[in-house]
Curated annotation (Swiss-Prot):
Subcellular location: Mitochondrion outer membrane
Annotated residues for binding of GTP 2: 428, 430-433, 528, 530, 559
Name of protein: Mitochondrial Rho GTPase 2
Biological processes per GO annotation: cellular homeostasis; mitochondrial outer membrane permeabilization; mitochondrion transport along microtubule
Family label: Belongs to the mitochondrial Rho GTPase family.
Function (record text): Atypical mitochondrial nucleoside-triphosphatase (NTPase) involved in mitochondrial trafficking. Probably involved in control of anterograde transport of mitochondria and their subcellular distribution. Can hydrolyze GTP, ATP and UTP.
Amino acid sequence: MKRDVRILLLGEAQVGKTSLIMALVGEEFPDEVPSRAEEITIPADVTPERIPTHIVDYSGVEQTEDELREEIAKANVVCVVYDVTDLETIEKIGSKWIPMVNGNAERNSRLPIILVGNKSDLQCGSSMESILPIMNQFSEIETCVECSAKNLKNISEVFYYAQKAVLHPTAPLYDPEEKQLRPQCKKALTRIFTISEQDNNQILSDEELNFFQQSCFGNPLAPQALEDVKMVVKKNTADGVRDNGLTLNGFLFLNTLFIQRGRHETTWTILRRFGYDDALELTDDYLYPPLRIPHESSTELNHFGYQFLQKAFEKHDLDEDGALSPSELQSFFSVFPYTPWGPELASTVCTAQGGYLPLHGYLCQWTLVAYLDVHRCLEHLGYLGYPILCEQESQTHAITVTREKSIDLEKGQTQRNVFLCRVIGPRGTGKSAFLRAFLGQSLEEQQQSNKPPSFYSVNTVLVGGQEKYLILFEVDVDTEFLKTSDAPCDVACLMYDVSDSKSFNYCASIYKQHYMESQTPCLFVGCKYDQGEVKQQHGISPAEFCHKHRLPPPYHFTCQGTPDRTIYSKLATAAAFPHLHDTELSTASFWLRVALGATVAAVVGFTLYKALLRSK
């Protein structure tokens, strides 16, 4: 919505332009009228829409044509004033003033025009018979108001309609020649309907209609009013009401009716509540609400976010099989202007039979987006209507910004639930297979798969009895680590091929260059263990290297057969406890402490639960 409104009054000499302005401001007909009034600014607090309004007069005696063109260029709306008793001033509306205002402008970019018939006190009848042909000829004419500056009749209405033409314009919504909603408006209202009907049955129930009404207008509809609305739709459409609910066609018809009856502010209120601007595009303020993220912090979905996303999943899982089919996923993304997830999704998260997306994989993908690009995540939540459906100011309500990592290290504990692991190693080590194994795919299954590759894989692991999300990122040796800023992560997995004698050198070099002086926990993983281990050409063995640098001993891994998930838990645990020395992570006493901590937490929780039950 515009922040202010600039109204320009045009018309032939002596039609009463200046008198109208002075009558509005002084609330009386002026005894003496200057040839032109100074620009008037009406403050926001005295206008119905709470928007400051500037009213500009025009005088052909005082102003040149160049000055007139400048004023037209600055105006948001033009009031063409005519004398209801003078047919020549009416004729000049179409032959002179409207062509001067809009000239050769494109239909969608023309200035809105209000026709103002002044001096109605001097005429018994109405000028509308002469005006209607002009209104039919020029679609940019919003309305016509007959008034009297002398009797103060309809003066405030003139400027109200002018303001309304700017703040709630008809042109973006409705094509008066075709007598139907414009495509962009229909598209926006279809998205709004899809968001508002929350069980995906293509019908707005009474409950959903009331929630929609409350959200947009601040109060629910009375039961009789609901029935009256449906009755109007039913009488005028063949399929607007079904199973006592409003269909999409019924919803579109209602908005068309509002506009045709001059109540387009109703449709604009709906559109703006759902984030649309005057061009019917979602605003940046709606899609990208401000979120402060300190340098060492990360971003995660909180339980509000997961709860909302699970509900959205269940809405589109029509067959209730716990997984979204391609058509169900397409339905899910119907409120997006584009499909945000590509074919690599199948290699990023766990999928069900036939490539369907189960709830677990779906939540993992959202977790990945929230961690890597929170602003994109906020955008996606905005498309789904999070602020409206959750009755929140913005979708930042669904996001937790974690404590800075330096504070976690200082306090010796972290509250994070999502960790990033960089998987680093020379080409051909088996990094991609390691990522796919995290999703439960054996090497044989990977070789038979035609899924497109992904540099990420996301899954959950247990750390001390608690479920955490672990994101694996495969570092491209050709493009990554060009600078130190490429290295940060929660844990580094340095992977070498035990069957290649030159493989360990790369990992040792990366460790010394980027991680030896850092506080990032590191684990060395010897891959392809099933192919036999050879001596590494490094001077000292991988085990000796790890011992020398106080790291846990190398973990041997193979993708043959059923993947072993132990290493993934070790990586997540190292990320969750970065304050501990790396060698402590490999000791039995550490793992016992983690297990005992989880057990104690469970016992305390159960004891509190029983105490609460007794108190009830």
